[in-house]
Curated annotation (Swiss-Prot):
<dbReference type="InterPro" id="IPR045222">
    <property type="entry name" value="Rpb4-like"/>
</dbReference>
<feature type="modified residue" description="N-acetylserine">
    <location>
        <position position="2"/>
    </location>
</feature>
<dbReference type="InterPro" id="IPR038324">
    <property type="entry name" value="Rpb4/RPC9_sf"/>
</dbReference>
<dbReference type="GO" id="GO:0003899">
    <property type="term" value="F:DNA-directed RNA polymerase activity"/>
</dbReference>
<comment type="similarity">
    <text>Belongs to the eukaryotic RPB4 RNA polymerase subunit family.</text>
</comment>
<dbReference type="InterPro" id="IPR010997">
    <property type="entry name" value="HRDC-like_sf"/>
</dbReference>
<protein>
    <recommendedName>
        <fullName>DNA-directed RNA polymerase II subunit 4</fullName>
    </recommendedName>
</protein>
<comment type="subunit">
    <text>Component of the RNA polymerase II complex consisting of at least 12 subunits. Interacts with NRPB7.</text>
</comment>
<dbReference type="GO" id="GO:0005665">
    <property type="term" value="C:RNA polymerase II, core complex"/>
</dbReference>
<comment type="function">
    <text>DNA-dependent RNA polymerase catalyzes the transcription of DNA into RNA using the four ribonucleoside triphosphates as substrates. Second largest component of RNA polymerase II which synthesizes mRNA precursors and many functional non-coding RNAs. Proposed to contribute to the polymerase catalytic activity and forms the polymerase active center together with the largest subunit. Pol II is the central component of the basal RNA polymerase II transcription machinery. It is composed of mobile elements that move relative to each other.</text>
</comment>
<dbReference type="GO" id="GO:0000166">
    <property type="term" value="F:nucleotide binding"/>
</dbReference>
<keyword id="KW-0539">Nucleus</keyword>
<keyword id="KW-0007">Acetylation</keyword>
<dbReference type="InterPro" id="IPR006590">
    <property type="entry name" value="RNA_pol_Rpb4/RPC9_core"/>
</dbReference>
<dbReference type="InterPro" id="IPR005574">
    <property type="entry name" value="Rpb4/RPC9"/>
</dbReference>
<keyword id="KW-0804">Transcription</keyword>
<keyword id="KW-0240">DNA-directed RNA polymerase</keyword>
């Protein structure tokens, strides 16, 4: 990203390093950290000695703000959002915040309505309905 152009997440001007990065939703990070914590419990008599304060706080945060807890639901959410040609950034914002209406989704991720993209209101509504089904049956 050139020094002249300001970063703006609403327009997906977030820098090349972020556009190319693989993003994880809170629920995905939660699964990874929980798995690591379980591994530490198995190899240590006192697993809390093996866990840093940063690890513990990070795990608490992602558990608290994860909208999906079941590993199958987490997989389904990523699959649903991936079908809609979203960037990783958009996918994670929608997966973390779980908007319920098209208006909420566009307010949270204005780039959904960028010219030339195939995200009309009906497509966004279908995506949100699919996500709500996953949440309902989790």
């Amino acid at each position: 990203m050139s020094g002249e152009e300001e970063e703006n997440a609403a327009e997906l001007k977030i820098g090349d390093e972020f556009l190319k990065a693989k993003c994880l939703m809170n629920c995905e990070v939660s699964l990874i950290l929980e798995h690591k914590f379980e591994q530490l419990q198995q190899i240590s008599e006192d697993p809390m000695n093996q866990v840093s304060q940063v690890f513990e706080k990070s795990l608490q945060y992602v558990k608290r703000f994860s909208r999906y807890k079941n590993p199958d639901a987490v997989r389904q959410v990523r699959e649903i959002l991936s079908r809609h040609q979203l960037t990783e950034f958009e996918l994670c914002v929608l997966g973390n915040l779980c908007p319920e209406t098209v208006e909420e989704a566009v307010a949270m991720v204005p780039s959904l309505k960028t010219k030339g993209r195939a995200h009309d209101d009906e497509a966004i509504e279908k995506m949100l309905n699919d996500l709500s089904l996953v949440k309902r049956f989790e």
